[in-house]
């Protein structure tokens, strides 16, 4: 086995993964939660913006709004993480025994 060639391949794979991860972290994803809330979240899971439809804002029922916001943010995070994992898994060659 040529360890130098293997080391070069690993370095190349590491560079590719780092590049894809950085690109993903900078990308902004829009998630529309049931038409009530739009969450804009970056791949690094920082929330860029939250837009709320006026019709769901009821000053006398803040609990419902809080529940909707929590659900929207959790869904945005979950979907973003799944997309990140899919991209990373597609980048790592199968059968390498590395992961």
From Swiss-Prot:
Sorted UniProt keywords: Cytoplasm, DNA-binding
Localization terms from the record: Cytoplasm, Nucleoid
Any GO MF annotation of the entry: DNA binding
GO cellular component, one term: bacterial nucleoid
Subunit structure comment from the entry: Homodimer.
HAMAP family per the UniProt record, alphabetical: DNA_YbaB_EbfC (MF_00274)
Family, per entry: Belongs to the YbaB/EbfC family.
NCBIfam families hit by this protein: DNA_YbaB_EbfC
Function comment: Binds to DNA and alters its conformation. May be involved in regulation of gene expression, nucleoid organization and DNA protection.
Name of the protein described by the UniProt record: Nucleoid-associated protein UU088
Organism whose genome encodes this protein: Ureaplasma parvum serovar 3 (strain ATCC 700970)
